[in-house]
């Protein structure tokens, strides 16, 4: 994503592997597109496909063509009415970004099979039968831009961190390590988006696919005294919640923490005895250290062994980001000089 951000004045990260780039004011988009593709491959080794069009929805259509047809060389540009019409005629209605399964069924009853058929429907019908989102998609396919760039990702309204265990867990000590780690991660995410939590949920459950084992599923919701993103507090209350729901005698498969009632501000409680300024300075220092040295500083309750961690035997290699996984190649080099060549 950093390589993409360097090429354009404005970028919206849409997902972990997808982004929208604002190319307004750029004349030679063909050259820029080719340059971006080459730079990403050189910098990461990852092939990337680009779809360029007047709107985000049309850009998604173009991107599908760039991925699907080798003749495009990973770059498809919809910059004329003829190209737009042809692309929509070749795109099934179910492949359009923003059109759900229920809407597809409704449109098919109207004889709509392709994206082009959809654009031929009267705008009044679309507005009446497909809500504001459907009308926006209809306009975007017409080439009318209706979706603004979100250069700053919206803050999450709920944060969940959970993980299945690598093996069944029966003791509360191991469960506490996992819960503390999940709660710590949630607190970190809160601080990253400058938010505060007003409540949290801790949950545990067994493996419901193991019919030969007794089943147990419980959760508890805890309302925090004041909105907070402090790791010590969130871990404390998550562990308190675990103690109320943990039951001995079961083999647990998964546990997690969900942060809810997220707000962008906090306020001190009347009887709050915690030195908030001191704790905030401590948290900032820990975040700064962990930013430079990943997860170097953590709470003792989180443990060090991580015996509960999910098994990850089939992970892809991190050849470009982990120095210990850099591929080494053994080869033999044959050298000769001009003098040696003359002697022969």
Language-model segments: residues:
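Charged substrate- and nucleic-acid-binding regions of tRNA-handling and nucleotidyl-transfer enzymes
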Residues: 265-334
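DNA-contacting surface of Y-family translesion DNA polymerases
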Residues: 105-249, 331
């Amino acid at each position: 994503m950093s390589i993409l951000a360097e090429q354009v004045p404005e970028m919206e990260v849409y997902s972990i592997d997808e982004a929208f780039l604002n190319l307004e004011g750029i004349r030679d988009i063909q050259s820029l597109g080719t340059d971006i593709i080459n730079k990403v491959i050189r910098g990461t080794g990852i092939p990337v496909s680009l779809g360029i069009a007047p709107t985000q929805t049309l850009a998604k259509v173009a991107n599908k063509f760039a991925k699907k047809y080798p003749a495009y060389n990973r770059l498809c540009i919809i910059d004329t009415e003829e190209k737009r019409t042809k692309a929509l005629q070749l795109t099934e209605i179910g492949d359009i970004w923003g059109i759900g399964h229920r809407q597809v069924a409704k449109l098919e009853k109207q004889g709509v099979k392709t994206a082009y058929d959809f654009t031929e429907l009267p705008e009044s019908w679309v507005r009446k039968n497909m809500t504001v989102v459907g009308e926006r998609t209809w306009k975007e396919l017409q080439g009318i831009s209706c979706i603004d760039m979100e250069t700053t990702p919206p803050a999450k309204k709920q944060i969940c961190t959970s993980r299945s265990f690598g093996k069944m867990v029966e003791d509360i000590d191991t469960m506490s390590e996992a819960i503390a780690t999940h709660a710590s991660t949630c607190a970190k995410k809160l601080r990253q988006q400058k938010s505060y939590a007003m409540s949290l949920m801790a949950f545990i459950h067994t493996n419901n696919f193991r019919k030969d084992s007794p089943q147990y599923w419980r959760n508890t919701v805890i309302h925090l005294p004041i909105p907070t993103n402090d790791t010590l507090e969130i871990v404390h209350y998550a562990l308190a919640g675990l103690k109320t729901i943990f039951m001995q005698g079961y083999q647990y498969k998964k546990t997690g923490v969900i942060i809810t009632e997220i707000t962008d501000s906090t306020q001190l409680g009347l009887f709050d005895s915690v030195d908030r300024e001191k704790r905030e300075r401590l948290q900032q220092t820990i975040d700064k250290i962990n930013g430079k040295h990943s997860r170097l500083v953590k709470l003792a309750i989180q443990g060090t062994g991580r015996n509960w961690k999910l098994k990850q035997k089939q992970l892809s290699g991190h050849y470009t980001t982990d120095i210990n996984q850099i591929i080494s190649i053994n080869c033999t080099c044959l050298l000769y000089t001009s003098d040696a060549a003359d002697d022969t």
